[in-house]
Regions:
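Active-site-adjacent mobile loop/cap segments within catalytic or ligand-binding domains
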Residues: 36-52, 101-177
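Active-site proximal loops enriched in glycine and acidic residues that flank catalytic Cys/His/Asp
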Residues: 128-131, 201, 216
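An aromatic-rich alpha-helical recognition segment common to small helix-rich domains
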Residues: 182, 197-201, 212-214, 230
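Conserved aromatic anchor
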Residues: 193-207
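Recognizes extended acidic, P/S/T-rich segments that occur
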Residues: 209-230
Length: 230
């Protein structure tokens, strides 16, 4: 997407177009940046990556915020669950890669093209390298005081970039194989020792079963699951 550094123009245009044309978007994976493995701090690490995701949705209504106050879910936005899913895929399929869930929209004072999609209600995350080198970002090509500035191909760790590209490919393939998410989902449990989940059963013949995941509220990742059939 173009115009990122000038004001996220490409993302804004595409997100608006997708919204106006009723695109069915289940997730946006913004890869920015995935090719550098040596940070300005001198650390070289090609075994980790970060996944940034927003908490509460920016389009949340006052009524939704009121309900969330009593039911929780501050760390259960669609974007954050997408990040958890990508992390699970990394653990399952990508060797020697540990993805770290970062509970923020982006780095402090920074932005990326996933944000315009969040702004209109789509689940979107930022996948990026762990260690950044700011001498290679937003710089004119030059050498000053023995320091080389600028983003050039010499600094690309292609093996690392391939690893994160593979993560994207496997994630998208896994999501594409899945049927549509259930509709009419509700949760209840007042004056009960347990929680009741309900949803509209799908008529899709490819749906053979539903699996429920849960975790302690203090845990970042899903801990438990149960297959409940169809």
């Amino acid at each position: 997407l173009s115009g990122e550094e000038q004001g996220l123009f490409g993302g804004k245009i595409l997100a608006k177009y997708a919204q106006e044309h009723d695109w069915r978007v289940h997730g946006v994976l913004n890869n920015d940046m995935i090719g550098n493995s040596t940070g300005i701090n001198g650390v070289t690490d090609n075994t980790t990556a970060r996944i940034f995701s927003e908490g509460t949705r920016v389009i949340e209504t006052k009524d939704q915020a009121h309900k969330r106050r009593f039911t929780g879910g501050e760390v259960d936005s669609a974007s954050r669950n997408l990040a958890r899913y990508i992390d699970t895929i990394a653990d399952r399929y990508i060797e020697n890669l540990d993805t770290m869930l970062v509970y923020r929209l982006d780095r402090f004072g920074r932005g990326g093209h996933h944000r315009p999609f969040n702004d209109v209600g789509f689940a979107a995350v930022r996948i990026m390298e762990t260690n950044e080198n700011y001498n290679q970002q937003h710089q004119d090509l030059r050498t000053e005081n023995g320091i080389t500035y600028g983003d050039t191909i010499d600094y690309v760790d292609f093996a690392y970039a391939a690893k994160l590209t593979s993560l994207n490919a496997v994630t998208m393939a896994s999501m594409a194989w899945a049927p549509a998410p259930p509709t009419g989902v509700s949760i209840s449990g007042a004056v009960k020792p347990s929680t009741t989940l309900a949803w509209h059963k799908s008529d899709d013949p490819t749906v053979v079963s539903y699996k429920i995941y849960w975790r302690y509220t203090s845990e970042p990742k899903w801990q438990f699951s149960r297959d409940v059939g169809k």
